């Protein structure tokens, strides 16, 4: 989101956990523009896509400052989580879009540790 980009500066990173196919289908144009701005700002991205989102992951793999992996099928959910600084942003666009933001250092660190475990298990 624009809020996220406003909080980030060159050298920062974003981790995305569980990017679902449905969200990419609905918001692909937005994600393309957001990623252009992110790359221009010098912000790196590590994204764990749901298993069924490979067509979108293949597009993102070509972007600078971007690493992509895919979660196991049994871990797929309609919601996803964005992690940056002390923020945990959870989104779900399955039916009525829902988004909530937590700003808490300990909570963000817990989610990042979970992300790192999943990242190590995920496939390229």
Language model: regions and residue ranges:
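Interdomain hinge/linker segments and adjacent boundary elements that couple functional modules
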Residues: 1-26
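PLD/PLD-like phosphodiesterase catalytic module centered on the HKD motif
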Residues: 1, 23-124
């Amino acid at each position: 989101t624009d809020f996220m980009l406003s909080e980030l500066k060159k050298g920062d990173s974003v981790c995305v956990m569980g990017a679902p196919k449905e969200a990419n289908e609905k918001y692909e144009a937005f994600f393309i523009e957001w990623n252009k701005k992110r790359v221009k700002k010098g912000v790196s991205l590590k994204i764990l896509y749901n298993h069924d989102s490979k067509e979108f992951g293949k597009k993102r793999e070509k972007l600078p400052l971007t690493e992509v992996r895919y979660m196991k099928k049994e871990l797929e959910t309609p919601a996803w989580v964005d992690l940056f600084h002390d923020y945990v942003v959870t989104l779900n666009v399955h039916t009525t879009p829902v988004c909530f933001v937590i700003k808490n250092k300990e909570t963000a660190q817990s989610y990042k540790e979970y992300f790192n475990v999943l990242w190590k298990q995920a496939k390229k």
